[in-house]
């Protein structure tokens, strides 16, 4: 049977809620009604692939089939992979370099800096950060350990492969691009093994404390343009999980539209950067308990 039997462009309220509850349980991300068309298109794609003829049939497959684990991974992949690119938001990059990284390198000279890109997608932010260290000659002064994580298995696999479209690397400085990328067929370019070896990538669900704690402690956590996808309860859990990966003087960087005003018991603002905010852990003795 073919999914072409499904003719409605969007799901009705009952089955849509089943899917959104399922997604929320797995990821902490809440899909609102405005995302109905987007979600429906993804369900249709996977239904056609499996030869299923209704939204209900695919939902049943996701939740009861003995082989559902792999399909759940694929479904989460197609609804969570977001477009990104190298050197995204140049003012933000420059401010991060000048106001955060340079002082940190000076303070940690002769030591190690650990950075976590908490929702790294296909690795663009991770590799951009590595290039910042190379460009500024900081690797003579410190060793860098950088980890990228994402809930999407496909995104993490792509990050490890390090193959990108020309569009994704359009902002990379020519000196960097010429030295560390190799042109491929089909308007794609491959990152050098030398750079790929400097990063590690893991599949991590940010709302699962056992997964985030296993990463260890970091000097900087990058979590930009991610928290907007969580509701308040899930966001609080994610923030506590990030909190546990940070030292007292570590910094969390979020996007400019992601202020943490309602979570001052977890993080307190330190400085506003260009299109970004930097936060430190709230001091002990705040009014809400960390469970």
Question: What is each of the regions a protein language model found here?
Answer:
Residues 110-123, 147:
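Conserved class I S-adenosyl-L-methionine
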Residues 273-278:
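Short hydrophobic/aromatic beta-strand or adjacent loop that forms the aromatic wall/cage
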